[in-house]
Every structure is written in structure tokens, then in C-alpha cells.
UniProtKB/Swiss-Prot annotation:
Keywords: ATP-binding, Ligase, Mitochondrion, Nucleotide-binding, Protein biosynthesis, Transit peptide
Gene Ontology MF, one: ATP binding
EC class name: ligase
Membrane spanning residue stretches: none
A Pfam match: GatC
Compartment(s) of residence: Mitochondrion
GO biological process, one term: glutaminyl-tRNAGln biosynthesis via transamidation
Protein name: Glutamyl-tRNA(Gln) amidotransferase subunit C, mitochondrial
Function: Allows the formation of correctly charged Gln-tRNA(Gln) through the transamidation of misacylated Glu-tRNA(Gln) in the mitochondria. The reaction takes place in the presence of glutamine and ATP through an activated gamma-phospho-Glu-tRNA(Gln).
Presequence extent in this chain: 1-27
PANTHER family assigned to the protein according to its UniProt record, in alphabetical order: GLUTAMYL-TRNA(GLN) AMIDOTRANSFERASE SUBUNIT C, MITOCHONDRIAL
Length: 136
């Protein structure tokens, strides 16, 4: 019951917001600078080393600019794309247990009983060549 009240309160608060603020160029020049690429690579750990990757990024930015231009005044935000029906959660029944060791054997790398995945589209070999991240 309380979760529904909190959800409705958050939804009402979200209606009052007109949009998000961003440091991005509001006109959407569409050009991606070297400085921006370095910043995005640092944030996302995705390598934009090829012209094809940069072109794909510029295309995604242009698409986002087109979406930003859509007039959504007076449009109620949706809770779900399936608002016309009830979505019930299934019961969570554990069928097997104590199989963590078996599952972790499927991973390329494991650290302290956790899967370690390569970030973004940077392969393990490229990561091994780079300096480790400094934790500040």
C-alpha cells in the first residue's frame, strides 16, 4: 500500500519537471570533438577508435536531437507500456541451489565469487595493455 503511495507521489513530482538540464549544445551541432570522445571513453569504457564508431555515435546523437524536438506538452507519463492490463509477479521458487561454483567455471574471469565482464567493446587484451584505473 505504501509503495503505491510513494510511486504516485514520485509520478506527480515528475509531472512538474519540464525537462532535464544538460551541458550539451541545445542546438545539436552533431559534431563530435576529440575531447568529447575522450570523455565518453573514460565514462563508458567503450573504445571509439574507428571512424565507423564515431559515425555511429554522431548518428545516435542526431536521433536524440530529433527526439528532443518532439512536443510532449500535455502528454501524461506512462508507468508501463502495458498499462491496459495487470502485471502479476510470479512466485520465486528456487529449484536448485548451491551451484555457484559450477556456474562460475563458465566465466572467463572471476574475482571473489563474482563474474568479471570486459567493459563495453574493449577486449581483454586491450585492457591488459592499459594501466589500471586509479581509485580516488
Amino acid at each position: 500500500m505504501w509503495a503505491r503511495a510513494v510511486h504516485l507521489g514520485l509520478r506527480a513530482a515528475a509531472r512538474g519537471r519540464r525537462g532535464f538540464t544538460s551541458k550539451a549544445d541545445p542546438q545539436g551541432s552533431g559534431r563530435v570533438t576529440g575531447e568529447l570522445i575522450q570523455h565518453l571513453e573514460r565514462l563508458s569504457l567503450v573504445d571509439f577508435g574507428s571512424q565507423e564508431a564515431v559515425a555511429r555515435l554522431e548518428k545516435a546523437i542526431a536521433f536524440a536531437d530529433r527526439l528532443r524536438a518532439v512536443n510532449t506538452d500535455g502528454v501524461e507519463p506512462m508507468e508501463s507500456v502495458l498499462e491496459d492490463r495487470c502485471l502479476y509477479l510470479r512466485s520465486d521458487n528456487v529449484v536448485e541451489g548451491s551451484c555457484a561454483e559450477e556456474l562460475l567455471q563458465n566465466s572467463h574471469r572471476v574475482v571473489e565469487e563474482y563474474f568479471v565482464a570486459p567493459p563495453g567493446n574493449i577486449s581483454w587484451s586491450k585492457l591488459d595493455e592499459k594501466q589500471p584505473f586509479s581509485h580516488r
